[in-house]
Each structure stands twice: as C-alpha cells, then as structure tokens.
Amino acid sequence: MTSVLQFDKVTYYYQSGEQKVSILEKADCSFEPGKLYTIVGPSGSGKTTTLTLAGALEAPKEGRVLFQGKDLKDIGYTNYRNRHVAIVFQAYNLLEYLNPLQNVLAAMEITKNEIPNKKQRAEELLLCMGLTKEQMRRRIQKLSGGEQQRVAIARALGTNADIILADEPTGNLDADTAQGIVEIFQELAHKDGKCVIAVTHSQDFAAQADVVVELKRHKLQQRREQNV
C-alpha cells in the first residue's frame, strides 16, 4: 500500500546552549492509511518532536517529510495542517470561553474539509468520548482533566483529516475510558481508512496497535506488524 506519510532521511536537532542535541539522524519511516501506529521510546527521546515534524509544526534540519509522495514544503505547511492532519497534544489548547460542543464545531469551521451535518457529527463524537449532552454545554473550566482530554480528541476527529496525531491520548484517563479511545482509533484506521499515529507509554495501548514504531538511537524503527 502507498504511504500517506513518509520520513525520508530526516535529521532534526535543537540547540541547548552551545550543545547540539540530536533527536533524529537520517531517519526513514513510512506510515500507511488504514493503520494504527504507536510510537514508543524512553522519556526525552523525541517522540513528541517526531509528532511535531509529522504535523508540520517543525521542519526537518535535513531530509524531507512527504505527504502522499509530495514534500510538505511544496504542499505548504499551512495548507497541510488545515486540510490533511489533526493533532492532539498533551496541552489540549481548548478554547476556555467555549463549551465542548462549540470547541468541536470551531475546529470543523477552520478545516478546509467538507463536513456535512456538523452539529450532529460533533454531538456524536462527544457522545462517543463519554460526554453527556449536559456536559457538552458546560464551560471547559468546569470539566475534569480527563474530560477535557476527551474533548480535545473529539475536536481532532471532527476535522475529518487524513492523518490523526496524538500525544499520550490515554494518559489521564481511567482504564475503561482509555480502552474506549483505543477502540475509536482502531475504528478510524480500519473502517475509515485514516492513518492514526499515537505516542504512548502504555504497553496495553502499544500492544493493540497495528504497527509499533520505536524511537531508538535517533532512528525510527518499525517492529513487525502485530496481529490485533
């Protein structure tokens, strides 16, 4: 199957004082549609930075990140972010003056993708995340951390992007809710054909991915595909 996202000899580093700290060194990795990937590795190894490169929030120092075979520089970083990728980071970046339903609808309005029946779809996503209709209309500040995380995930899913990126999406959730998130990601990949890439420390989550990508020695190493 053709890759939807590809790292082609990507090198990335940052400066810490006079020291250059390497994250990736000529790293290659391909991600296909219709699969759930997890990225694993030690704390501080650069897993979140890898997501920022995949989401065009950072650019490689060397090498290329490709979407459907085209360099993101040629597609345009803003166009790529607005149309093709949705990101859930640990800092949820929710609009606190809006309620959960309005947050999801706001993301739907910003995306360049066509989304029919926006309000109905937004409500369905929030219900799938375990929020009640009453909670959908609460101010964000009145929700727990776990509830806010679910809203952030629903907001990303509502954009109908080709690629879903998530940084520790089950980190603040109880076991049952976390499993529900994993199953939603699996459905997005297997039924909707999305490419879902999640950073996780959870062995349970990683075990349920189609492919595990390990960040090791500044390379992205794909383990063999798992039978899930």
PLM regions with names:
Residues 63-72:
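Conserved ABC transporter NBD signature motif
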Residues 139-143, 147-149:
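Conserved ABC ATPase signature
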Residues 72-86:
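ABC ATPase NBD coupling module
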Residues 164-167:
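Catalytic Walker B motif of ABC-type/P-loop ATPase nucleotide-binding domains
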Residues 117-134:
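Conserved ABC ATPase "signature" region
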Residues 98-107:
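Short coil-to-helix segment of the ABC ATPase nucleotide-binding domain corresponding to the Q-loop/switch region
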Residues 55:
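Helix-to-loop junction immediately C-terminal to a conserved catalytic motif
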